[in-house]
Amino acid sequence: MIYKRSSQLFADAQKVIPGGVNSPVRAFKAVGGEPIFIEKAEGAYIYDEDGNKLIDYINSWGPLILGHAHKPVIDAVIEKAKKGTSFGTPTEIETKIAELAVKMVPNIDKIRMVNSGTEACMSAVRLARGFTGKEKIIKFAGCYHGHSDSFLIQAGSGAVTFGTPNSPGVTQGTAKNTLLADYNDLDNVRKVIEANKEEIACIILEPVAGNMGCIPPAEGFLEGLRKLCDETGILLIFDEVMTGFRLAAGGVQERAGVKADIVCFGKVIGGGLPVGAFAARNEIMDYLAPVGPVYQAGTLSGNPLAMAAGLAMLTELDSKRGIFESLEKKTKYLHEGMEKVLTENKVDFTINRIGSMISVHFGTEPVTDFASAAKSANLGVFNKFFHGMLENGIYIAPSAYETWFISDALSYEDLDTTIAAVDKVAKTL
């Protein structure tokens, strides 16, 4: 494929934007080469500035679960935009999307809208600290909760890719209150709690890790965390920015049957526009300003265009619950097809999948945590695989540590085309 215009646009962008991108993973530094610039997208496909058509497995890093330019979402945004783009006042549509989210998600009474997943997680931790009166938090190595200072301590994806799991600019004062534990290791979590008795406000985690590849929770892990939190008074925060409204209408809480105290959302809830949210039971949410002492605010929080997109998206997912079964079947079909051709081509690999989230690791050991993800990354093989897939019209995440997100817009013909491309590329690895 030819990427002449993308190359020129990247050169232009680097003159006025740091690294030429507004989020590091987009720069292709992890895989080499130059990023492609997208002109438009529809359904399962993206079209770059050079006219190349690609089957998309990123879907804007997860929000576009029904595919690009989904008509009900686009129509809702257009109609709302005709009435104005932002008011800085309450609007009816904020209440409507809140009512629908509370209906769909178990164990929440109220929800606060913000502008990103980072903001949601940052606010949730502040709320947990305010509610409990304690300062320390536990996060898991390799789990990513956005670029807030408290979370850039052995974060996943971009931080790992660039070899800088601790970002300059994060102070020791901030870092000392973030305690690290190993994902899928309850004994390790118990030890961390024991060493910091009566000091921990919350445990925050991706209930399905998505930033060290896709790593589902081990059997009993989430249940064990719930039990530990009940025993110690620590709040359990599920960062469902990736999994919320994707793995089930009610997210991981519904799918796994495990209750969180606070839940964070992003991606799908905005329908492709910038939206984050955090939610909990009344007792916790009523600690938020203006009714409680914990301050949180935002000029564009609850923006009417974003709320229109989110409401249209959630309405589709709520009214057509068969979408989740369809996504499960399509992702399983892709999983089994890739597994077959990679095995036939004698490639060392493991594939992790849950629902419509999937990742390929080029190693033979099971990938269950940060250490095993790093061991199985095999960046040289992955980078060759990435560029081979791109050359064959398939756009996957440009990082060995990122999850692929399946949209329901994908047809089985698209999946067969993808499996054939994997077969072709595997012969070169």
Curated annotation (Swiss-Prot):
UniProt cross-references to CDD domains, sorted A to Z: OAT_like
Subunit structure: Homodimer.
Tagged with keyword Protein biosynthesis: no
Keyword annotations from UniProtKB, A to Z: Cytoplasm, Isomerase, Porphyrin biosynthesis, Pyridoxal phosphate
Catalytic function, reaction form: (S)-4-amino-5-oxopentanoate = 5-aminolevulinate
Pathway entry: Porphyrin-containing compound metabolism; protoporphyrin-IX biosynthesis; 5-aminolevulinate from L-glutamyl-tRNA(Glu): step 2/2
Protein name per UniProt: Glutamate-1-semialdehyde 2,1-aminomutase
GO CC field: cytoplasm
InterPro entries given in the database record: 4pyrrol_synth_GluAld_NH2Trfase, Aminotrans_3, Aminotrans_3_PPA_site, PyrdxlP-dep_Trfase, PyrdxlP-dep_Trfase_major, PyrdxlP-dep_Trfase_small
Coarse class of the protein's main subcellular location: cytoplasm
